[in-house]
């Protein structure tokens, strides 16, 4: 029996999680994607199949303020605060957290904690 690669394990975990996570207009889904150099967060209404707001380390607003590259915990904290600020500005108070198959640790945990500190509930 062959072992799964780390990426395949993440994809398998993500498929398993997505069976139970859906975002509605009342409580949209906060989806997180993590690459080696950047982190992306979107607030998604799955019923309407639309992205309500997003933030990432690629945003010009954040890029100027980041000292390191986008693959650090500090960058994740900044993205979490920004996505929470944008969601609250659109009237979204509560979300369902979708960690995207990643383990709840490190940059994913930093983003989630920052979003909670900024006022999002999940």
UniProtKB/Swiss-Prot annotation:
GO-annotated molecular function: 5S rRNA binding; structural constituent of ribosome
A GO BP entry: translation
The entry's keywords: Ribonucleoprotein, Ribosomal protein, RNA-binding, rRNA-binding
Residues passing through the membrane, by range: none
Segments of this protein annotated with the region Disordered: 1-26
SUPFAM superfamilies: Translational machinery components
Gene3D superfamilies on file: 3.30.420.100
Compositionally biased tracts (Basic residues): 1-21
InterPro entries, per the entry: Ribosomal_uL18_bac-type, Ribosomal_uL18_bac/euk
Gene Ontology cellular-component annotations: cytosolic large ribosomal subunit
Presence of keyword Isomerase: no
Keyword Ribonucleoprotein: yes
Record Pfam families: Ribosomal_L18p
Summary of the function given for this chain in its UniProt record: This is one of the proteins that bind and probably mediate the attachment of the 5S RNA into the large ribosomal subunit, where it forms part of the central protuberance.
Family assignment from sequence similarity: Belongs to the universal ribosomal protein uL18 family.
Self-association state and partner proteins as the record states: Part of the 50S ribosomal subunit; part of the 5S rRNA/L5/L18/L25 subcomplex. Contacts the 5S and 23S rRNAs.
Name the record gives this protein: Large ribosomal subunit protein uL18
């Amino acid at each position: 029996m062959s072992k799964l690669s780390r990426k395949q394990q993440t994809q398998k975990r993500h498929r398993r999680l997505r069976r139970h996570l859906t975002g509605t207009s009342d409580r949209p889904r906060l989806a997180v994607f993590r690459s080696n150099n950047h982190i992306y967060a979107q607030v998604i209404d799955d019923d309407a199949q639309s992205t309500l707001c997003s933030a990432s380390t690629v945003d010009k607003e954040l890029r100027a303020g980041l000292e390191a590259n986008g693959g650090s915990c500090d960058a994740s904290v900044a993205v979490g605060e920004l996505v929470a600020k944008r969601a609250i500005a659109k009237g979204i108070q509560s979300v369902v957290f979708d960690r995207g198959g990643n383990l709840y640790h490190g940059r994913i945990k930093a983003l989630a904690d920052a979003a909670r500190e900024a006022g999002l509930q999940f």
